[in-house]
Amino acid sequence: TRVYAAKLATITETFIGNALQQLQFSAGVQGRQLSDAVALQVETDRVLAQSMAFNSTFVIDADGTLLSVSPAPLRHLVGGRMRSPGVDEALHLRRALVSTPYVSAANNLVVTLSQPIIDKQGRYLGYVGGTLYLRERNILNSLLGEHFYKDGSYLYVVDHQRRLLYHPDNQRVGTVVQGNALIDQLPTLPSGTVALTN
C-alpha cells in the first residue's frame, strides 16, 4: 500500500506538471492575441480539448476581466470581472500557480492551475487558467478513484487546511476534516504510511 500510494503521488505530481506546461505554452500564444476575441476563444477551446486535463479553461486579463472561457455553457461570464479567492491569488502572485480550493463564479468547488501572460516587454497581462472541478469527474479524480483495495481501504487527499480535495464519497469533498488522528499527524510526518481504523 505504501509503495502504491507513493506511485500515485508521483503520478499526480506529473499530471500537475504536465498541465502547467500546457498552460504555459498557451499563455505564450494568448499573449500575442489578447485583442483578438475569436483567436482567444479558439486557443481556449483547444487547451480544454487537447488532453481533457481540465473541466474548464479560461483567460483573465490583469484587471480580472474574463476574456474567454471554455466550455461554451460558461461563455455568458465573458466580459465580467471575476472575483474569487483563486482569481485574486493568481492576479496577486503573477506566477505559475496551483490555487487553494475555492467556489468559482459558476458555483463549482475548484482548484485552478494558472500561468501568467507576460508580453515581450515583461509586462504582466493576466493569466491562462484551467480548473479541476473537485466534485465532478476529471482525469485526476478518475485516477485516484479507480483504486479501491479488497480489504476495504481507500485513499483520500487533503490540503494544508485539512479540506478534502478527493474522497471516494463525493459528498465529503470540500469539507474540513476534524478529529482525525492521521490528519493530526500529517505535519510531523516526512512521508510513509500510517495504519488507521476508520
Where are these regions (language model features)?
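Juxtamembrane extracytoplasmic/periplasmic/luminal helical "stalk" adjacent to the first N-terminal
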Residues: 1-38, 46-53
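Extracytoplasmic/secreted envelope proteins and their assembly/folding machinery
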Residues: 2, 20, 24, 41-45, ...
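Solvent-exposed, extracytoplasmic
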Residues: 36-53, 73, 83, 123, ...
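Extracytoplasmic/periplasmic ligand-binding sensor regions of membrane-associated signaling proteins
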Residues: 50-53, 57, 62-133, 137-139, ...
